[in-house]
Amino acid sequence: MQPQIRNMNLLKLRLSMVGTLATIIGLSTLVFAIIMSLVGVFDILSLGVVVVVFNLIQWLISPYLIGAIYRVRELSENENPHLHRMIGNLSKKSKISKPKLMLAQISIPNAFAYGSPLTGSHVAVTKGLLDTLNEDEVKAVVGHELGHLKHRDVQIMMVVSFLPALFYYIGFSLMLSNMYRGRRDDNGGSALIGIGFMVFSWILNMFILYLSRLREYYADRHAVSVLNNGAQKLSTSLAKIVKTTRRINETGKSKQQKPNLSAYKALFISDPDRANEDSVELAIMENKSNQNLVRELTSKKLTFADKLLEAFSTHPNIVKRLRALQELS
């Protein structure tokens, strides 16, 4: 269940959010590790405590950060009773409590699920999503996001994302210890060990990216399970999201939003900055119906570059994702 590729970026899953927040955690932990090393109070246990604490704090306050960055506000039932009923019905089918419905004032069509014990669960839709998709397509996107909440993907990815950060900063701090505390009697042994830890953290992170992509497929399956003809609806919604994002980028309508979108674009269903690059073929297929567009994309042969880009992505390749949805139809 996951994705970024040369043709188009996919349903943004809650998991990409966690990946973005992990970057913030990592940078903060790095600063603390440097300080602790330089002042002479560094040890493995203290660094581990710092990493754990920062992960927990980041997770707890992340809804507030997301709300500020994306101008998210709660959408009252009076403003959009139909959307509230839709999410309520899908939540019942998903056998979860209805999350808070949020609206992000962004013209690019997208949606995301997030939350913490302090705020509860949220599903946010952008203004652009409501303006672009029809009712069935919005249902498919929301069903995908509810799948992330049902499967507790936020919590799972938060826990596993902590591990590579821990090993990386242990390795980095070992290198700092060798450089700044005069430990040269080991002939650079601690520095080599530190490099080994950093390489291991990178390898571990590749497995975590793979896990994230699997959970994207899992969320897609959930959307299909709670909707009639869900596979087709989710497929067409993805095609329309990419087409519209590309058009908005080309006309420059989202320029004022781009700095924020670029900073935390991993939170989204699809990468708004990659829409032009990821949809070269879409320019040729622009006038085709959404169903024809889906068929064109699923027939595309994946290149080595496509597969390589997917390996470093939190989401699956769009072609593979659409093919998986076809198998569920």
State the predicted function of each range:
Residues L146-A165, N229-Q232:
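Catalytic Zn2+-binding segment of zinc metalloproteases
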Residues Y70, N134, V138, G147-R152, ...:
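Active-site-flanking alpha-helical
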Residues L75, K127-A140, F207:
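Short pre-active-site segment immediately N-terminal to the catalytic Zn-binding motif
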Residues A111-E135, R152:
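Active-site scaffold of zinc-dependent metalloenzymes
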Residues P63, I87, V125, A140-H148, ...:
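Active-site recognition of the HExxH zinc-binding catalytic motif
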Residues M1-S116, S161-R213, Y217, G230, ...:
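Hydrophobic or amphipathic, alpha-helical segments that drive membrane association/targeting
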